[in-house]
Curated annotation (Swiss-Prot):
Reactions catalysed, as given in the entry: ITP + H2O = IMP + diphosphate + H(+); dITP + H2O = dIMP + diphosphate + H(+); XTP + H2O = XMP + diphosphate + H(+)
Subunit structure: Homodimer.
Name assigned to this protein: Inosine triphosphate pyrophosphatase 1
InterPro entries: ITPase, ITPase-like_fam, RdgB/HAM1
GO biological process: deoxyribonucleoside triphosphate catabolic process; nucleotide metabolic process
Length: 196
């Protein structure tokens, strides 16, 4: 068993520091891990490496966060990948969204035959520089023709998951989204690894 596994398995008071400044992410993580892990939150202004790999980005941020906190951390990175664009915007979706918004994301697919896309989320748990574990969740779906829904955050109004019964993430109740989102799936993998 890895040292990081022992840190969560060996105590009835599991605790990890989630590194995010995004309140929506924090709420989703706390809802998914409620009753299993005490999630503390810290907002660290970490430089984000430029890479097309959410695994590399998440790992890099986790190691930096651990170096600052000197305690177990959980860091997440997400990508929204359009089939027609060879996987773009991918992990750059945050910057695309900030500059062009949901309608701009949709317009990126004008003239293409497919609106297929997938969302992926990677959580990196870092208990020390030598104990770095990663957990991925993926959700296939499509980009809708116009933003729909008022809930969620970020690009939730443009992504309709295959498992979503025709709704975008922004149209779903939190409980439904937290059951099928890539973030939820990655957290399920994390909980399974630690037998939580």
């Amino acid at each position: 068993m890895a040292e990081g596994s022992a840190l969560l398995r060996g105590s009835s008071n599991h605790k990890v520091t989630l590194v995010t400044g995004n309140d929506g992410k924090r709420r989703e993580v706390q809802a998914c891990l409620e009753g299993h892990v005490l999630v503390e939150n810290v907002n660290l202004d970490l430089p984000e490496m430029q890479s097309d790999s959410v695994f590399e980005i998440s790992r890099n941020k986790a190691l930096m966060a651990y170096d600052i906190t000197k305690s177990p951390v959980l860091v997440e990175d997400t990508a929204l990948c359009f089939d027609a664009l060879g996987g773009l915007p991918g992990p750059y979706v945050k910057w695309f969204f900030e500059r062009i918004g949901p309608t701009g994301l949709i317009k990126l697919l004008e003239g293409f035959d497919t609106r297929r896309a997938y969302a992926t989320c990677v959580f990196t748990y870092c208990a020390s520089p030598d104990v770095v574990l990663q957990f991925e969740g993926r959700c296939d779906g499509r980009i809708v023709e116009a933003p729909r829904g008022e809930g969620g955050f970020g690009w939730d109004s443009v992504f309709e998951p295959d498992e979503g019964c025709g709704q975008t993430f922004a149209e779903m109740q939190d409980e439904e989204k937290n059951r099928i989102s890539p973030r939820a799936k990655a957290l399920v993998a994390l909980k399974a690894h630690f037998c939580l």
